[in-house]
């Protein structure tokens, strides 16, 4: 949802996901998150596992470990929520009552931000989101705070040699929004910003180039949940051409050697809704639904010699692991081709550990990843801890009060680069594992 709201902008130069933090929502009472910024003192696997941008190194892959229910999935869900808030800001700013009755929009607007539930004081406090990205070697930091459905604060800064404030908002009212530098052209239109809408989203909607560039990068982030095996792969016209299918088959055949080809049929339905004829220059919200049918072709044999092929419904006859693999492959290759960031929840779900290692390795290889794509994934697979930097690994831990914290492996004392990290993790040295002592 949201195709056509924020203008397409060519992706220039080096683009990098740096960090995402969230506070007072889900299990996150305090502001917490991860960063891909590598620590200068850690030299292990520096060349293989990091990119260098303007003298700083950033990790290609970040792994998030933790017990079930510790907040790993909630962390990725918070990023998705931030993206939806950006889209909903433009929808709300359109002041179009018919648009608000569209089922998908109505459902999203009826799902307010939930504050941390296990501290009664948090209900009356703001929920906070912050994201950092590098575009054309400039670090942009965008944050906002929301309470009772209204934007209380909003801040956008950029930094190359020094930090410059581009947006500073100190209340829900548009009169309390200060715009500078690349956002100055939006000053004469700032009155369209509602109390429940983000200023940066509205500036992008009204064709401010800087706002569009930043939000396009944030909206390009894909979040995949590997547990949703029942869903069809996320296919469209661009990722089902002959070349793309060949790329998928190369890896699918590892799981199913009888597989010879895939047939993908797409049926698209697009609903277009005019946002506003006056204020928003006839911009449209496009809700696109694609029905996907996948047939797999398999070799048939007689006396161990191939004699033909048989066509089978992919989702019915393939294993859960093979289905999950096809579900994630398009997103992986799109990220690698575009140099964008992919977030995967439960990356090992249904896949053999060697396959997970193989797919993750695509992001570490200069040959398959020349465009600086990044992978952020949650996992329980300890085999992935082999050959990683200590600052690539994060642990989520939930305390007795229901509060989730996230801590980098490199922040733990007495952890050396040659330690058996997997063994220490399973022994509970870093926490972030189920507490089974009370059952003994």
Functional labels for PLM-detected ranges:
Residues 17, 140-162, 174-181, 270-297, ...:
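Short, well-ordered strand-loop elements centered on a beta-strand within folded domains, enriched
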């Amino acid at each position: 949802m949201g195709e056509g709201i924020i203008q397409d902008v060519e992706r220039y130069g080096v683009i990098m996901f740096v960090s995402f933090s969230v506070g007072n929502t889900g299990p996150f009472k305090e502001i917490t998150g991860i960063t891909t910024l590598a620590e200068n003192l850690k030299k292990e696997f520096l060349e293989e596992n990091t990119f260098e941008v303007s003298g700083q190194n950033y990790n290609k892959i970040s792994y998030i470990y933790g017990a079930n229910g510790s907040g790993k999935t909630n962390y990725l869900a918070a990023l998705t929520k931030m993206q939806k808030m950006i889209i909903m800001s433009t929808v709300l700013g359109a002041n179009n009552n018919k648009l608000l009755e569209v089922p998908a929009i109505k459902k999203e607007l009826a799902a307010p931000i939930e504050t941390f539930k296990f501290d009664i004081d948090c209900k009356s406090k703001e929920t906070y989101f912050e994201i950092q990205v590098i575009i054309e070697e400039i670090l942009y930091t965008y944050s906002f705070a929301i309470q009772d459905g209204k934007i209380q604060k909003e801040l956008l800064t950029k930094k190359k040699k020094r930090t410059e404030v581009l947006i500073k908002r100190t209340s829900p009212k548009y009169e309390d929004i200060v715009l500078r530098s690349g956002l100055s052209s939006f000053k004469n239109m700032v009155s369209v910003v509602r109390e429940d809408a983000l200023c940066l989203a509205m500036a992008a909607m009204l064709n401010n180039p800087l706002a569009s560039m930043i939000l396009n990068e944030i909206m390009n982030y894909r979040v995949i949940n590997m547990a949703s095996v029942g869903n069809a792969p996320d296919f469209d016209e661009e990722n089902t051409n002959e070349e793309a299918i060949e790329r998928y088959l190369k890896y699918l055949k590892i799981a199913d050697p009888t597989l010879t080809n895939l047939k993908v049929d797409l049926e698209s339905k697009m609903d277009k809704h005019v946002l506003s004829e006056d204020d928003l220059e006839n911009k449209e919200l496009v809700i696109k639904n694609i029905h996907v049918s996948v047939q797999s072709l398999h070799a048939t044999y007689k006396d161990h010699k191939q004699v033909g092929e048989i066509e089978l419904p992919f989702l019915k006859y393939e294993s859960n692991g093979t289905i999950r693999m096809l579900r994630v492959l398009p997103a992986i290759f799109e990220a690698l081709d575009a140099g964008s960031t992919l977030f995967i929840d439960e990356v090992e779900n249904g896949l053999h550990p060697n396959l997970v290692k193989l797919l993750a390795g695509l992001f570490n290889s200069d040959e398959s990843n020349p465009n600086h794509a990044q992978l952020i994934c949650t996992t329980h697979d300890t085999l992935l801890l082999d050959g990683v930097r200590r600052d690539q690994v994060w642990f989520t831990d939930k305390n007795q009060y229901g509060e989730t914290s996230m801590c980098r492996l490199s922040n733990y004392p007495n952890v050396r680069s040659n330690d058996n990290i997997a063994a220490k993790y399973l022994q509970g040295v870093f926490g972030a594992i189920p507490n089974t002592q009370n059952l003994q």
